């Protein structure tokens, strides 16, 4: 069982961290992690009874009020077609100002894709992203419109927006960016100006490129008695699962399915109830796949409301 744990009182975060470290030293069957991606502390334990024991210890021994939530889903963002964006950053407030203008094209990246069509490719950086997927950054500038010394700053701006995607703030992946034109000023152009221009040009293009939200899909293996196969398969299908196969393993049948992670919350309890505790399962990450349009729309709306509140 995995849950998100947080303190009820905002000033107790450090106390909760200390309590979790103490519990980890006492109990090797539990562990926790602080996820910078979904901004939650995740508590992993053996089941609901184990979770209740841990909660009792935190509340009665460590004297902390805590709450448990459903873990957020680590979505990804990408694009489905080619688009272009441009942005001029200009700021003047006495003395040297800030100026940069960037034109770029973005495309969905795939292995073996040809060079950018209609552009003069001068150099290319292939970046393996920490969160999976790639960013291909191409210098296609001709005529010295932008000094090459500013390209790393444009890349920084692109990367910053890919770490906080335009749709839901999720990581973006598998995109080729080709910078092909722009303008600079002898005095006012600097690294921060081109970083800002690159970020906004990329964001503009991303929104125009039919962006797609991706969700993690997990391979789920369920081991159950033969007479319970129908019920287990039916339950997996209600969770948007796609059953891929079934085979005998000893006295059990192994059912293999691909299921969205968002549908697997509290599956351990559901499976135990469905099979009277006679089944077990494993699950591991498989791939990312597009979410349904309605799901994407709702998540984008929620993100927009959150950003308004933050502002």
Feature-to-residue mapping (PLM):
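Accessory interaction regions appended to the cores of large information-processing enzymes
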Residues: 1-311
